[in-house]
């Protein structure tokens, strides 16, 4: 065991430029970090990410405000996704050695009437919208109708998701969760095979004051095989989940999980883990980048959130011990400067840091996100999974 604890922080949707297969997803030109940097110019400051080597990943095509560090304190590279989709589930499962190879169901024109009728019959409520929509726009446009009628707002996006929004004043949280659990049960198999069912509670009395609450809940497909988290847990190691990690893996392979209210809260919980004595893996997802800024195509808010994270990253670095390893990455892109409102197929950054390592080395372009999980397994002397190549020996 080289490191007693490994911390992985997933910056949800923070891509670093179009992937080699971006054309297959109509995402040529997508560049989440690059376009945020272009929006801010030299005001874009990420000093902690920069010193770890974020700018070194693409020194030949610099991110505005984030030049290459000389030398970088960490190891730097980028990873290519091999899963057939570009959803959070695909990205996280692949990181943990389980690439998604069977396509999920997508419903760009709304869900079939048969499915809608089942939801209406089970809930005793009518269903409105049933088409792709931005989550904030849909409650602005239909929230007052939902509040007046008690209907379910059902909508989707460019991802494999079925989302149900309801005002807590007319549909209590427990009821919304029960409806979503039913929706999950009936959409596991083909012809639906929907990646995630998401409960989207909101509050407020009119469209000028509606806001989504932090009680969102994701009901994902259960992992279709053994993940690296399962392997770590089976070896008796601690596997701590922060944020929506627990939802993404349906609780599998996790010894302790905590939901979070925001990026800030996610980092507070991660720092708390770092101040706790454990042996194993802490896995954090920071979803605000994606949910609040990427889908809403808000480069200003996205950049501000990255700079706020960078400050908290400094706090985390200050409490990490010499036998800790920090890995920072992302699960897909969601370029706020790109067309549409959906995820973008991009490379994701890979940063590795430990205070006892010399750093300043490139990890190159990894051919799958699964290299991250393979590295963690090798560190803890666990049997390797079927996918992924460890880069542990490069960390020296």
From Swiss-Prot:
Example GO BP: 5-phosphoribose 1-diphosphate biosynthetic process
Cofactor note: Binds 2 manganese ions.
Location within or outside the cell: Cytoplasm
EC number: 5.4.2.7
Keywords: Cytoplasm, Isomerase, Manganese, Metal-binding
Keyword Chaperone assigned: no
Pfam family of the protein (one): Metalloenzyme
Pathway(s): Carbohydrate degradation; 2-deoxy-D-ribose 1-phosphate degradation; D-glyceraldehyde 3-phosphate and acetaldehyde from 2-deoxy-alpha-D-ribose 1-phosphate: step 1/2
Molecular function GO labels: magnesium ion binding; manganese ion binding; phosphopentomutase activity
Record: residues binding Mn(2+) 2: 290, 295, 343
One Gene Ontology cellular component annotation held by this UniProt entry: cytosol
Binding site for Mn(2+) 1: 12, 331-332
UniProt function note: Isomerase that catalyzes the conversion of deoxy-ribose 1-phosphate (dRib-1-P) and ribose 1-phosphate (Rib-1-P) to deoxy-ribose 5-phosphate (dRib-5-P) and ribose 5-phosphate (Rib-5-P), respectively.
Name under which the protein is recorded: Phosphopentomutase
Species of origin: Latilactobacillus sakei subsp. sakei (strain 23K)
Species lineage: Bacteria, Bacillati, Bacillota, Bacilli, Lactobacillales
